[in-house]
């Protein structure tokens, strides 16, 4: 309910305040849809604490309303796709990385042995679609559906999709930034020019040195991750 949600928010705010008074002089809140979206965040936090002792980085996981929350000044940094940031005034947009499209299958699926997936590999299979897919992914899904050579059904979100993959109900195309690299599933690159331009947004009114250092730390980690699948 709304009331219980408000109580949880207040409890979290009190706990954060206690943490802040105890150890930190500055706090940077980062809104993202899921934990794995910024895979190098833990390493960035470690590096930042060495360079800027006393700066705390607090992740906020907001699958649906991250943009709205950011615009209400409820977070300092927003992980987003570039398409989400157009026509938003008063923000700075910092390029982070480009992410490709991957096919997610069970590790025992014959397709798991392939190095690259084409449309022909997916024909005859059952594909999960929907779940708030970004524009680049929706266009690929629609192309496959229009071929008439696949079965498909809607999945409400990424976690539901993974459960369905694990239970053998279907396979799925997804952005690489959703990969948690746990090794539970096979993620195989899909042959497409479509990609997702992942960025970090900050408020133009926020000119803290610690914030600039945090953004630069993350950008460097992704720039140096040459062989890491994104």
Regions found by a protein language model. Name each.
Residues 51, 63-124, 177-182:
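Acidic, Gly/Pro-rich loop/turn segments at junctions of secondary structure
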Residues 40, 119, 123-148, 211, ...:
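Secondary-structure junction motif
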Residues 88-94, 99-100, 160-209:
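Beta-alpha-beta core module
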Residues 63-67, 71-74, 81, 132-187:
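Hydrophobic hinge/microswitch elements
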Residues 1-22:
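Alpha-helical "hinge/linker" immediately C-terminal to small N-terminal DNA-binding modules
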Residues 32-38, 82-84, 101, 106-116, ...:
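Short coil/turn segments
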Residues 25-85:
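Central regulatory/effector-binding core of bacterial HTH transcription factors
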Residues 120-123, 197, 201-230:
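Extended ligand-binding regions for polar small-molecule ligands
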């Amino acid at each position: 309910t709304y009331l219980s949600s408000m109580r949880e928010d207040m409890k979290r705010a009190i706990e954060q305040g206690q943490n802040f008074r105890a150890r930190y002089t500055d706090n940077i809140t980062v809104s993202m849809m899921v934990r794995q979206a910024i895979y190098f965040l833990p390493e960035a936090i470690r590096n930042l604490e060495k360079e800027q002792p006393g700066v705390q980085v607090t992740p906020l996981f907001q699958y649906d309303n991250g943009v709205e929350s950011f615009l209400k000044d409820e977070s300092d940094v927003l992980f987003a796709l570039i398409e989400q940031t157009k026509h938003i005034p008063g923000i700075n947009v910092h390029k982070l990385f480009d992410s490709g499209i991957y096919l997610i299958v069970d590790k025992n699926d014959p397709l798991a042995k392939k190095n690259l997936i084409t449309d022909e590999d997916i024909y005859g299979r059952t594909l999960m679609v929907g779940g708030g897919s970004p524009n680049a992914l929706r266009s690929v899904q629609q192309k496959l559906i229009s071929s008439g050579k696949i079965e498909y059904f809607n999945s409400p979100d990424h976690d539901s999709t993974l459960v369905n993959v694990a239970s053998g109900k279907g396979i799925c195309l997804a952005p690489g930034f959703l990969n948690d690299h746990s090794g539970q599933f096979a993620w195989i690159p899909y042959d497409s020019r479509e990609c997702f331009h992942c960025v970090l947004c900050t408020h133009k009114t926020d000119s803290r040195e610690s914030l600039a250092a945090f953004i630069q730390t993350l950008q460097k980690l992704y720039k140096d991750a040459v062989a890491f699948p994104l």
